[in-house]
Amino acid sequence: MTAARGRTRIVTVARWPAALALVSWRYLWRTTPLHRREEPGSVADLPDSLDEGDRLHPARQGLGAGVGPLLHRCYAVRIAGSSMSPAELIEIVAANLNRASPEMAVFAKTRGAEGVLAVGDEFVVRMPGPWDGPVQVVRRDPTSFCFATLHGHLEAGQIEFRAAADGDGLRFEIESWARAGDRLSDLLYNRLRLAKEIQLNMWTHVCVRAAALAGGRPVGGVTVRTRSLDWPPSRDTLS
């Protein structure tokens, strides 16, 4: 780790009290039920491509560049009462990510046109906790888009946002495959679990906001499944 990057990490840690206070406040006033499940992972939890986006950016920070276990997380909400199609919902979310994100997180676009989301666009996610970091859009289709982390992010991996029809409603999901970006991040995320809770609060908020942006309401709360896989995967895991 360079001296400059080390100083950045120290500043990030210093900002944690405010982030944790906000997370605690949200938990106290949460009205949408949250259903959490944690379980051991398997080779089935690996993303379809471990190298998603490598050809787009030489500074891609893939899973192999990370530290600690792979965490495969999926946040999902069923939306009732919306007249939108899955593509219409994703278009609204993608056009302005800050409409769906909590106020503690700001998506600052550093490459690409405003108001649209295309492959190759880049953002820096600004947060008062351990989430400041650059990302790039590596996949975009009518009902989904995917970010990959770039060098300097506190995680190494990728995250996908998608919507689909679910009976007479919609289903909005956020799925991530990530490892800590360095040893300090591994400590704060996997050992102390502080960053993990901030992340959970952020993405469950996005799920609830997606329901509102769709003109509907969450049904049954938000489900969060976390599967942890040691890295590199063992032969037993791969068998």
Regions found by a protein language model. Name each.
Residues 2-126, 233-239:
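Hydrophobic ligand-binding cavity/cleft-lining segments
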Residues 74-76, 124, 146, 160-162, ...:
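Beta-strand secondary-structure signal
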Residues 126-167, 238:
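Hydrophobic-ligand binding "helix-grip"
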Residues 131-133, 138-139, 149, 180-182, ...:
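Beta-strand-enriched cores of mature, soluble protein domains
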Residues 152-197:
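Beta-strand/loop substructures that line and gate deep hydrophobic ligand-binding cavities in soluble
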